[in-house]
């Protein structure tokens, strides 16, 4: 079977696990942006995320970001000196979700 299709099937299964609150496709894209920037030690601010036109309109991004925060996937780093910016970071649940997807990708490549 195609490794990509295996991954898609495994990822859908992960998304349906009870410990991971449901996310929309757009929320997953936003979560990916937050995770990638955090990994590069350059966390996105709320303002930077909202300004990425390729994702959606600012209002739509803000709505989905609020859902991600309420669901516990994303938080704001409060341990910064400049209180004018609000860097977005993955929460432990966000890291667990990304780790589960990573394991699914590795598993799909072994088949």
Model regions and ranges:
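Basic, amphipathic "hinge/linker" alpha-helix immediately C-terminal to the N-terminal HTH DNA-binding motif
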Residues: 81-98
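Short amphipathic alpha-helical interaction segments
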Residues: 55-70
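Residues within the helices of the helix-turn-helix
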Residues: 46-48, 66, 86
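Beta-hairpin "wing" of winged helix-turn-helix
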Residues: 71-84
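Intrinsically disordered, low-complexity serine/threonine- and proline-rich regulatory segments
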Residues: 1-20
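N-terminal helix-turn-helix DNA-binding core of bacterial DNA-binding proteins
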Residues: 16-56
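A generic fold-level signal
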Residues: 2, 23-25, 82
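Amphipathic alpha-helical dimerization/coiled-coil segments
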Residues: 6, 14-15, 99-111
